[in-house]
Amino acid sequence: MFFKIYDNLIDQESLTKLNDTLFDKFFPWYFFNKSVDSVNDQENLFYSPPVLRHCFALNGQIDPTRFFLIEPVLNSIAEKVQSNVEIVNAHANLMMASAVTTDKLDIPHIDLDGCPEDCYTAIFYLHDSKEPTVIYNETTDSNSTIDVSKLSIKTKVIPEKNRLSIWRTPRIHSAPGSVASPRIVINLNFRILNHANIV
């Protein structure tokens, strides 16, 4: 199943503007008690930390005030896959360094239940970080069917500034359960409208 990593995704000016805006003290962030809450983890194998989030697009509806910040990312994705892309969801996630540190990962999940075949998930990293994104071999069309005790790791993506990882949305993934320093990523869900060049 399709999985790619692209480095040096966007130009330096766009990257600097995005970083400066998201790290600005007046940028609006919204608190979520858990980063993932739709997956059953009865055996307590994972830990879903609190997260601050800012939404750029939800269910195809774009926030016109700040969406322009991530347009260079989407334009570069379209160029890489040689197809127009149609945004579904896009948000920034901010994990803060916490007194609660754990080796556990965040709860494995997919971003969209019942997603169509042409739907993809991507994570764009704004800065270097030690804590990886974990990509699993398993796929699903619903978070409610994930058996977290039976997952096997396909790869770990180390966050590097201006790096993008992309895969088909049914592939299960997870973030770190805690971080040593503030970690911001842009999470994107979108449709690729022409699959001819997807391998």
Language-model region placement:
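Catalytic core of non-heme Fe(II) oxygenases with the double-stranded beta-helix
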Residues: 67, 71-199
